């Protein structure tokens, strides 16, 4: 093909691409009826939530949490895992150096980041995500 023919084919292809409706954006795919129905459903859910909030505000008896004695025993879960966890008193202030919080932070941090001392946390995190770095080959 010559230059003029390739230019005209390219131009026609570009024109066809521009004229097709965009399928990547979901807004173009929604019809007004479907959009209206979804907005009405959202409005109904919001009205239900506001009615529930107003009912809770008008009846203070519904807001009070039940104590352990008021909860029926069939609704409570007496598993061994809950018994093994230490119970904290509600009036106990939690400090940064509390051993319970230290254990929770230790569980939260991945083992690689806890035991790492190679380059620092940021580099170790990048190394663990990419498989490169000093901790990339070690398996936990």
UniProtKB/Swiss-Prot annotation:
Superkingdom of origin organism: Eukaryota
Post-translational modification: Cleaved by CORIN upon secretion to produce the functional hormone.
Signal peptide: 1-24
Marked site (Cleavage) residue numbers: 111-112
Residue spans of biased composition, Acidic residues class: 71-80
Keyword Disulfide bond among UniProt keywords: yes
Disulfide bonds: 118-134
Compartment(s) of residence: Secreted
GO cellular component, one term: extracellular space
Key words of the record: Disulfide bond, Hormone, Secreted, Signal, Vasoactive
Region of interest: Disordered: 55-94
GO terms for biological process, alphabetical: blood vessel diameter maintenance; cGMP biosynthetic process; cGMP-mediated signaling; embryo development ending in birth or egg hatching; negative regulation of systemic arterial blood pressure; neuropeptide signaling pathway; receptor guanylyl cyclase signaling pathway
UniProt GO molecular function: hormone activity; hormone receptor binding
Propeptide: 25-111
Family listed: Belongs to the natriuretic peptide family.
Stated role: Hormone playing a key role in cardiovascular homeostasis through regulation of natriuresis, diuresis, and vasodilation. Specifically binds and stimulates the cGMP production of the NPR1 receptor. Binds the clearance receptor NPR3.
Protein name per Swiss-Prot or TrEMBL: Natriuretic peptides A
Annotated source species: Gallus gallus (Chicken)
């Amino acid at each position: 093909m010559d230059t003029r023919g390739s230019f005209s084919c390219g131009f026609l292809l570009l024109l066809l691409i521009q004229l097709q409706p965009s399928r990547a954006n979901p807004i173009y795919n929604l019809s007004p009826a479907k959009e209206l129905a979804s907005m009405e459903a959202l409005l109904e859910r919001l009205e239900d939530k506001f009615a529930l909030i107003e009912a809770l505000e008008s009846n203070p008896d519904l807001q009070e949490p039940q104590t352990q004695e008021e909860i029926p025993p069939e609704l409570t879960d007496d598993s061994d895992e809950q018994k093994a966890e230490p119970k904290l008193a509600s009036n106990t202030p939690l400090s940064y150096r509390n051993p319970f919080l230290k254990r929770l932070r230790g569980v939260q941090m991945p083992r690689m980041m806890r035991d790492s001392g190679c380059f620092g946390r940021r580099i170790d995190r990048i190394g663990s995500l990419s498989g490169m770095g000093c901790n990339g080959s070690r398996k936990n």
